[in-house]
A protein has these predicted regions:
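A glycine- and small-aliphatic-rich helix-loop capping segment at beta-alpha/alpha-beta transitions
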Residues: 339
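N-terminal capping/lid subdomain adjacent to the active-site entrance of alpha/beta enzymes
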Residues: 1-212, 217-219, 226, 233, ...
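Active-site donor-binding loop signature of nucleotide-sugar glycosyltransferases
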Residues: 48, 242, 350
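Catalytic core of soluble alpha/beta enzymes
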Residues: 184, 189-330, 334-336, 355-366
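Short, solvent-exposed coil/turn elements at secondary-structure transition points
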Residues: 9-12, 161, 269, 323, ...
Length: 375
């Protein structure tokens, strides 16, 4: 029988994080500690973290709902996926807790499946640790070349919104430490100043040397969006995230049809938690890419669904963290390694664990432009 304890923590940003929805100075998270009477002393930890004004489940009654869902999981012995589709951050926190519990259980029981032998799930079950149906994919989440410290995941450097001078300084810092893919959050200052910043980069670096991604966070007006996309396209931009605000499907579909540079949907996916609605969105808008954040887009279960549907339609994808602490970031990195591995080609939007003054220690480190697990 499983038991889940809930704790809270507020993390503090080293410097204010500017987004299109304001500036974050703190980050509030709930942590789930999962134990089982089948294996005393073994535990798994997951993080449930919403973003105010962005997450579809960032509601005043969140703490009460979280407690109720955890009690449900304790009684059922599994994650009731269909019942909690509207709560992606809770789904992801539970998945992370179970995945880290199973990983700890395998180490405690010294389970190392041989090739062609029984799966880790089967061996755990044989040793008295039940693996709920539909959750077998969580058992080996941390078992990959990345998880063993053998491979790194290429990530993009993120340049937050700020003044022209601040963004330029942050950009130069990212390039100096070795990033070859840089993402600029735009929309905070005059568009032509941001364009000038991009021009500065291209005056020095070709697209082969530095891949540029931009994130408009829905900041373009529909009537101006196409001309702004055309202006950006002159500088060999890899992609632009969410050029206009979400919930404008006909206009976004038109932009995706006529755009001179690839469009990636991000906020557009938030709150679209039912499979049939996901199909309708992808079939209507037909984006070039979708960007998946487990805390916002349905946890691992929901993101797997998005990736499957996107692949069927020839739509690309990558995975991004969403200002989680190292608990969430660690799980997202392992998930990206599983989904796109063993050799992850496309740079992922994973945080570096260096955003907060009081982050939770985790064996992750950046070497150049790659994220590694330290063994």
């Amino acid at each position: 029988m499983y038991k889940i304890d809930i704790s809270e923590r507020t993390l503090h940003f080293k410097q204010p994080a500017g987004t299109s929805r304001g500036v974050y100075t703190t980050r509030h998270s709930y942590y789930l500690t999962l134990t089982s009477d089948e294996l005393p002393g073994v535990e798994g930890v997951g993080e449930c973290a919403t973003l105010p004004d962005l997450s579809c489940d960032a509601k005043p009654e969140y703490a009460v709902t979280l407690r109720q869902v955890c009690q449900m999981v304790e009684q059922m012995g599994r994650i009731p996926y269909d019942m909690i589709r509207a709560y992606p951050s809770i789904t992801f926190g539970l998945e992370t807790a179970f995945a880290s519990f199973f990983d700890a259980a395998k180490k405690f029981l010294e389970i190392v499946p041989a090739e062609g032998a029984s799966s880790s799930s089967e061996i755990l079950t044989q040793k008295g640790v039940s693996v709920p149906a539909g959750m077998e994919n969580l058992v080996d989440l941390f078992d990959s070349p990345f998880g063993k410290g053998e491979e790194g995941i290429t990530i993009n450097g993120l340049v937050w919104m700020g003044t022209y001078e601040e963004m330029l300084a942050r950009l130069e810092e990212k390039l100096q430490v070795g990033f070859h893919c840089v993402k600029l959050k735009i929309g905070a200052i005059d568009f032509f100043k941001e364009l000038d910043l991009i021009k500065r980069i291209r005056d020095v670096y070709t697209q082969e040397q530095v891949e540029l991604r931009v994130d408009a966070n829905g900041g373009f007006l529909p009537e101006n969006a196409m001309s702004q996309l055309e202006a950006l396209a002159k500088y060999d931009i890899h992609s632009i995230e969410q050029p206009i605000k979400q919930h404008q499907w006909p206009k976004m579909a038109q932009l995706c049809r006529e755009t001179p540079l690839p469009i990636a949907l991000d906020e557009e996916l938030i709150g679209v938690n039912v499979r049939s609605m996901k199909e309708a969105l992808l079939d209507t808008i037909r984006p070039q890419y979708i960007i998946l954040k487990p805390s916002l887009h349905g946890g691992i279960y929901g993101c797997n669904e998005w990736i499957q549907l996107a692949n069927q339609r020839g739509i690309g994808s990558w995975i991004t963290s969403a200002l989680e602490s190292n608990i969430g970031l660690n799980a997202i990195a392992h998930y990206a390694a599983k989904v796109y591995g063993p050799d992850v080609k496309m740079p992922q939007g994973l945080g570096t664990g260096q955003l907060f003054t009081d982050n939770i220690p985790m064996p992750l480190e950046i070497r150049g432009d790659k994220l590694f697990v330290v063994k």
